Amino acid sequence: MCAVAYVELILYLRGDKFFTMADNYLEKKMEDYKAQPAAKRRSAASLRRLLLHHRSYRGYDPSFKVREDQLRKIIEVATLVPSARNQQVLRFRPVLDDEADVVLRHIRLGGALPELHLPFAGTEPRAYIVICSTVEESKYVDVDLGIVAQSMLLQATEIGLGGICIGAFDREPLRQRLNLRYEPLLVLAIGRPAERIELVECSEGESLTYYRREGTHYVPKIKVENLILK
């Protein structure tokens, strides 16, 4: 029953001797209706929306400038996510403005499309988060790295931005140029996306190489039937 119908029924019962009981009952039902089902629907829709809109963007709107507080909000996600043995060994270096040129010189994007020389001129990312580790890299550190990187990019999506994980970069030169105390493991580029990306369902064994056609970037994804082990 919709909210209007509940209100109309309450008004109708006001002259009835059972008004108090009916009023309390309907109010309780209304509270339940507003609380649990609606919250669950919003949560499910929100997660799916974020996952669908979170893509690996290589081109960004040059007219939009990422702010320091936006990078901080993204980095704050690290205080909320799990960490192996709760060691919390990852550290984060925000990069903006002129320093972005330093990072750009040491990263490589679009490895599967070398002929395009991505990103296109004028769409280069102008903000980054360099993720470092206070300890030697290990499988547990890499697990933490994956969790926090994905979570940060989802946060970026939620605030209207986008990004990409960059593993192809010159570690030692970047460490020296940014004067990093710890070894960099991953670079996140952040910005307002200027690309159209679509997912394409495919079967196991088919090509998984992303490609571009008429300005759209297509990303093959194996359908769920092939992902479930039986």
Question: Where are each of the predicted segments found?
Answer:
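Acidic, surface-exposed loops and disordered segments
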Residues: 6-230
